């Protein structure tokens, strides 16, 4: 019995399998007994390397999924009465079933951001009512890198947000489910990105892992409650060695960066090919592992007969096509052929 699709999916990087090196690491860790809950050598090594690469003076905590990472990270920064400023498109607002609100009892103060990126000016629009007990008081700004639209903040943009937040008594949480893709695009280090947040997540699942994320706490002063909140929120794995082994493999020889760079390159190849197909419009800059495009609704329906992908905005006829660490050039070229055929174009 198999649930695998016969041709490469462009629906999500979550559709991809596990990188062979990560799978080998899991199997190799599956020998004998190991201390549970993070007392194993795989987790110790992975956490130490994450701290080194990020420059964290605090700690790194391995968790099971992205929503859990976001809730834990936000919870470490929020006061009981405080709210979160985020883009309307932020994953914490659109795709996490109200997890932050339910678990943390917080309120999300959303801001329209066409390209998914906040700016100091946009953040300031949610300052109405600051100091008034009748209003939710912003305490954290949550940004996503890369964003839900595949765009990336430049390092200067991140620094501007961090400095603005510091000047206005706000903490910064960075949702880094696809942080590796941003690092690959910007040609920067993990520390370059992490230094512009107080707490951030560092994604593994979308980048070749089977299922693991890290919550990186940059300042030691923010760590005292982290272990307890992780347990309360159901994110402490008893057999932690299998999470640690995954990150250990990803961090060996910069596999995390190579995987992301490859996924980005495949998205860029797809975007370049689309430029040769009339009637297809790429609607956001292609800076990570995703292409958003507008095309005729009839062509979308035709293409979906043979290929898996998501219609992002049905009213605007915008689709989302995602690549992954295991997407091959031949997959992209075959998909481009399918797009051209659906549009009635013969590719040369």
Walk through the language-model features, giving the residues of each:
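Conserved PLP-enzyme active-site core in the AAT-like
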Residues: 2-306, 312-327, 335-348
């Amino acid at each position: 019995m198999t649930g695998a699709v016969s041709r490469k999916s462009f629906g999500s990087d979550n559709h991809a399998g596990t990188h062979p090196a990560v799978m080998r690491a899991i199997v190799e860790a599956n020998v004998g007994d190991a201390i549970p809950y993070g007392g194993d050598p795989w987790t110790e090594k992975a956490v130490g390397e994450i701290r080194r690469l990020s420059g964290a003076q605090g700690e790194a905590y391995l968790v099971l999924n992205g929503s859990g990472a976001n809730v834990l990270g936000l919870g470490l920064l929020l006061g009981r009465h405080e709210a979160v400023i985020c883009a309307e498109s932020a994953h914490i607002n659109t795709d996490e079933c109200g997890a932050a609100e339910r678990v943390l009892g917080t309120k999300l103060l959303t801001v329209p951001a066409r390209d998914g990126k906040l700016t100091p000016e946009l953040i300031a629009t949610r300052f109405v009512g600051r100091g008034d007990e009748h209003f939710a008081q912003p305490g954290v700004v949550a940004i996503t890198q890369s964003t839900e639209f595949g765009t990336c903040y430049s390092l200067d943009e991140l620094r501007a947000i961090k400095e603005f937040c510091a000047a206005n008594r706000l903490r910064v949480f960075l949702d880094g489910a696809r942080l590796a893709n941003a690092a690959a695009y910007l040609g920067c280090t993990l520390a370059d990105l992490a230094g512009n947040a107080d707490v951030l997540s560092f994604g593994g699942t979308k980048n070749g892992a089977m299922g693991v994320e890290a919550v990186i706490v940059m300042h030691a002063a923010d760590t005292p409650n982290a272990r307890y909140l992780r347990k309360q929120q159901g994110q402490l794995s008893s057999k932690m060695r299998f999470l640690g082994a995954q990150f250990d493999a990803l961090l060996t020889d910069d596999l995390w960066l190579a995987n992301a760079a490859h996924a980005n390159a495949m998205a860029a190849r797809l975007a370049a090919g689309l430029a040769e197909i009339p009637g297809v419009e790429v609607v956001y800059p292609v800076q990570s592992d995703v292409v958003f495009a507008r095309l005729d609704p009839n062509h979308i329906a035709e293409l979906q007969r043979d290929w898996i992908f998501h219609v992002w905005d049905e009213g605007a006829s915008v689709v989302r096509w995602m690549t992954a660490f295991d997407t091959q050039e031949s997959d992209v070229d075959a998909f481009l052929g399918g797009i051209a055929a659906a549009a009635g174009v013969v590719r040369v």
